[in-house]
Amino acid sequence: MRVDVLSREYPPEVYGGAGVHVAELVRALRARDDVEAHVHAFGAPRPEQPGEEGLTSSYADLAELSGANAALRTLGVDLAIAAGCAGTELVHSHTWYANMAGHLSALLYDVPHVVSAHSLEPLRPWKAEQLGGGYAISSWVERTSYEAAAAVIAVSAAMRDDVLASYPAIDPARVHVVHNGIDTADWSPRVDPARVRELGVDPDRPSVVFVGRITRQKGLIHLV
C-alpha cells in the first residue's frame, strides 16, 4: 500500500515535536514490507538514504508568492504537494501547514485523508500576532480538513476532547487516540545516581521535570 505522509517538517529541517513525530513514523512505516511510504515536506531537498531513493520530495515556496502572507505561501506549497501525490492510496497530513495538501489530494485522487492532531488553531489565538490575517486562513484550512477527514488521530485523550470541542461537526467515531511512542531500541532507562548528582539533581528527592520548547502554547506558566 502506498501511503503519502505530508508535513512541513522532516529531517534535517525539524524545529518541533511534530517533525520528530513524522520522522519516527516514517521510519517505522518504511520498515514494513506492506507499506511504501512517501514523504512530501516543505523546504530544501533532503538527502536520500540508500534504498529510499525517490520516496522523499521537498517543496520550496512558490517564487510568485515570495512577498505574500505566510499563510498564502503555505497554500502555494500545498497545491504543489497535492500534485505530487499522484498515485497515492492514502494521505496522512500533519499540522495545518500540510492539511490542505491532504484534503485536496483526497478530493483529487479519491483516497482517504488521515489527519494527526498535534495542536489546534482555535486553541492558539496568539498566532494572529505571527500570521495577521493569515490566522483566519490557517483556521479555515484546519477546520475544512478535519471535518472532511476519513480519520483524525489525537495524540492523547485530552487532545481528542479538544478536537471534538473545537470541531463538533466531526463524528466522534472518526477521532482515534494513538499516543506518541518511544522506540525502546534507541531509548531505555539508565539508572546512574552518581551521574544524576553530577548534574546537580538529588536522586533521593522527587523532581518535576519539563522537557519542551519554552513557548506560550506549552503551558509552562501553569507548571511554574
Regions flagged by a language model, labelled:
Residues M1-P47:
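N-terminal subdomain of nucleotide-sugar transferases
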Residues V91-H92, E147-A157, H176:
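A short beta-strand/loop micro-motif in the catalytic core of glycosyltransferases
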Residues V20, P206-V224:
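A conserved mid-protein helix/loop that constitutes part of the nucleotide-sugar donor-binding site
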Residues R46, P50-C85, E129-Q130:
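A short, charged, and often flexible helix/loop element on the N-terminal side
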Residues S188-V201, S207:
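A short helix/loop element that forms part of the nucleotide-sugar donor recognition site in Leloir-type
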Residues V111-V114, P122-T144, D161:
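Nucleotide-sugar donor phosphate/pyrophosphate-binding loop at the beta->alpha transition
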Residues S93-A98, A117:
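Short His-centered aromatic/hydrophobic patch
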Residues A158, G181:
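Carbohydrate-associated surface elements
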